[in-house]
Structure formats: structure tokens, C-alpha cells
């Protein structure tokens, strides 16, 4: 059964195994993101885990794929789990508003390891995070995907997502086409 787990040091070996097997939590940056995270974990595993939940947006600015830096917003990471690590899901928001800054493409993002795809883990993970998003005061969550990512589109629509726009991603994300969906809460 698919679960969302708060990252802990005890669960970290499953995450590290996925990174060493070629999975990356960031499809835009790719393998460099995995290498960076492995180095961070090796240097300070407990600190890495602690930073996966950042409800107060504390810390250094976030570096975007193009190298530009932006302020953090509140968020938390979950690890998708079903008899081991399956992927990660992130939830981001700003207090008091559903609006997101232009550099944040959606409230929810997820990535499932290749060897556990097509089992419904992403669909269930998104479903499981929606009550937490509602508890943050959000009336809806926005999720974006590439137009050709049919699997992600199915995940979003299975959770009630409605297409609200086709758009061009900001320069920091390559000025590529994207689709923005909204899931009402």
C-alpha cells in the first residue's frame, strides 16, 4: 500500500539506493541533482533529512536550473513508500494565499523511481497529500507537467485536476511548453 512518509535517517538508505541507481529527484537538472544530494547526504545525513521539511522557509536561497537564485517558500518533502522507497512528493505554498511566485511551477511535484512506475504510486501519493494542502488553507493545488508526459497527466486528472492553461515555462526552466492543472480542494 502506498504511503507518504516524512523523511527520516532510518529511511535514508532507500533514498540513497535510488540515487545511486540513477534516479534523480529533479528531472530538469538530471543526474547532477542526484550527485549533489549524495554528496550532501555523505557530509551531513541528519541535516539533509531535517531540511526536507521547511515550514518556515528558512535557509539559503534556492538555486534554479539556470543558476539564478530565489527566495525559499514554505514546503515539505514526503517520500513515497510501498515496501521500500518509490519516489518523492513535494508540497509548496505561501501562507495566506494560493498564489505562487513565478519561479514555483506548482504546489505539488513528484517523481517516482523507474522500477516502480505504472503501479499507481504517484496517483495515490497526490491523493494522500491533498488533505495536508487543504490544512494549509489552500483552496486548490496547481500541478504542472510537460505536454507529452501522458503518465503525469493521468495522475493529475485521476485526482480531479482540470487543465487551466498551456503556458511557456520561465527562462530558468528553459522556456519550454508546460500545462498547468488545478485540483480543487
Q: What feature does the model see in each segment?
A:
Residues 133-144:
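Conserved GNAT acetyl-CoA-binding A-motif
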Residues 10, 14, 125, 151:
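Charged catalytic carboxylate motif
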Residues 107, 140, 151:
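Amphipathic alpha-helical recognition patches that constitute DNA-binding helices
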Residues 109-112, 118-135, 153-158:
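Conserved acetyl-CoA-binding loop-helix of GNAT-fold acetyltransferases
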Residues 1-107, 114, 132, 166-185:
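GNAT-family acyltransferases
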Residues 143-153:
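Conserved beta-strand-loop-alpha-helix junction that forms the acyl-donor binding cleft
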Residues 117-118, 148:
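Glycine-/small-residue-rich active-site loops that bind phosphorylated ligands and cofactors
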Residues 157-167:
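Conserved acetyl-CoA-binding loop of GNAT-fold acetyltransferases
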Amino acid at each position: 500500500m502506498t504511503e507518504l512518509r516524512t523523511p527520516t535517517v532510518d529511511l535514508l538508505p532507500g533514498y540513497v539506493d535510488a540515487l545511486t541507481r540513477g534516479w534523480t529527484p529533479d528531472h530538469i537538472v538530471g543526474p547532477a541533482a542526484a550527485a549533489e544530494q549524495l554528496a550532501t547526504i555523505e557530509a551531513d545525513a541528519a541535516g539533509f533529512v531535517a531540511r526536507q521539511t521547511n515550514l518556515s522557509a528558512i535557509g539559503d536561497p534556492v538555486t534554479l536550473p539556470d543558476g539564478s537564485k530565489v527566495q525559499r517558500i514554505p514546503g515539505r518533502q514526503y517520500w513515497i513508500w510501498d515496501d521500500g522507497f518509490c519516489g518523492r512528493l513535494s508540497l509548496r505554498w505561501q501562507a495566506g494565499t494560493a498564489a505562487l511566485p513565478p519561479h514555483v511551477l506548482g504546489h505539488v511535484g513528484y517523481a517516482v523511481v523507474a522500477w516502480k512506475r505504472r503501479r499507481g504510486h504517484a496517483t495515490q501519493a497526490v491523493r494522500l497529500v491533498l488533505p495536508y494542502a487543504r490544512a494549509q488553507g489552500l483552496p486548490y493545488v496547481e500541478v504542472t507537467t510537460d505536454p507529452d508526459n501522458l503518465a503525469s497527466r493521468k495522475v493529475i486528472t485521476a485526482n480531479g485536476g482540470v487543465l487551466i492553461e498551456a503556458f511557456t515555462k520561465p527562462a530558468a526552466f528553459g522556456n519550454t511548453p508546460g500545462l498547468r492543472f488545478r485540483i480543487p480542494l
